[in-house]
């Protein structure tokens, strides 16, 4: 497979769009090396995760939304964001790349396990740095709080 990892913020990952199914993921990327179900009783969430370890990413599917693709975690060094190999960029370069593309840094946080998180909420993007080097990226769909729908009985 000639795979080119590309972040398409608010849309998807490479040729795989948010809202697509597990079957569609497997038709594009093949069978995952591992899959698992993650449940969070406090947040009342559940997702199925397809891990493509050799390709450097994991796909998350929302079990409470018909198992639709909702987010991805990437650590592949060849990943491209806005034409740049994002894993070769330093923190300030990532912030600048996002800024010139219309997204501002929302928050930063030092994680318990040692990584520093840069959050770009409007883009649905979190970048994790360890010792000044980008180590992983999480991005996904954004829940629109204004899209609440009331369905009468």
Q: What would you call each of these model-derived segments?
A:
Residues 1-153:
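Short helix/turn-capping signatures at newly exposed starts of structured segments
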């Amino acid at each position: 497979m000639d795979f080119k990892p590309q972040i398409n913020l608010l849309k998807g990952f490479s040729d795989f769009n948010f809202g697509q199914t597990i079957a569609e993921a497997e038709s594009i990327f093949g069978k995952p090396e591992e899959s698992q179900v993650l449940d969070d009783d406090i947040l009342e969430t559940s997702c199925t995760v397809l891990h493509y370890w050799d390709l450097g990413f994991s796909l998350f599917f929302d079990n409470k939304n018909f198992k639709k693709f909702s987010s991805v975690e990437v650590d592949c060094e060849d990943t491209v964001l806005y034409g740049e190999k994002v894993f070769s960029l330093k923190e300030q370069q990532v912030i600048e790349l996002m800024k010139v593309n219309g997204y501002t840094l929302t928050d930063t946080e030092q994680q318990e396990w040692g990584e520093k998180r840069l959050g770009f909420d409007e883009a649905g993007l979190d970048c994790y740095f360890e010792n000044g080097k980008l180590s992983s990226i999480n991005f996904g769909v954004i829940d629109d709080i204004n899209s609440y729908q009331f369905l009468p009985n």
